[in-house]
């Protein structure tokens, strides 16, 4: 049996520029990705460069709380 909490957890990555700029004028919405991370290897918040469909460019997507 597993001891304690699960090592791999599901996280949500959200576009930082969409959140900072508010609602985009061309396309309203905020880009979000769902992925997994290992708590053992990356205990801090995860930030990845992903494609934002609303900004139409690669931007920083940061981990948010559920």
Swiss-Prot record:
Gene source species: Dioscorea elephantipes
Family: Belongs to the bacterial ribosomal protein bL33 family.
Disulphide bridges: none
PANTHER family to which the protein is assigned, alphabetical: 50S RIBOSOMAL PROTEIN L33, CHLOROPLASTIC, LARGE RIBOSOMAL SUBUNIT PROTEIN BL33C
Keyword Signal: no
Alphabetic keyword roster: Chloroplast, Plastid, Ribonucleoprotein, Ribosomal protein
Domain of life of the organism encoding this protein: Eukaryota
Subcellular localization(s) per the UniProt record: Plastid, Chloroplast
GO biological process, one term: translation
A Gene Ontology molecular function term of the record: structural constituent of ribosome
Name the record gives this protein: Large ribosomal subunit protein bL33c
Record carries keyword Ribonucleoprotein: yes
Recorded GO CC terms: chloroplast; ribonucleoprotein complex; ribosome
């Amino acid at each position: 049996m597993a001891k304690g909490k699960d090592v791999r957890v599901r996280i949500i990555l959200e576009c930082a520029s969409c959140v900072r700029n508010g609602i985009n004028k061309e396309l309203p919405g905020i880009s979000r990705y769902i992925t997994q991370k290992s708590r053992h290897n990356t205990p801090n918040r995860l930030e990845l460069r992903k494609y934002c469909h609303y900004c139409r460019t690669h931007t920083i997507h940061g981990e948010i709380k559920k």
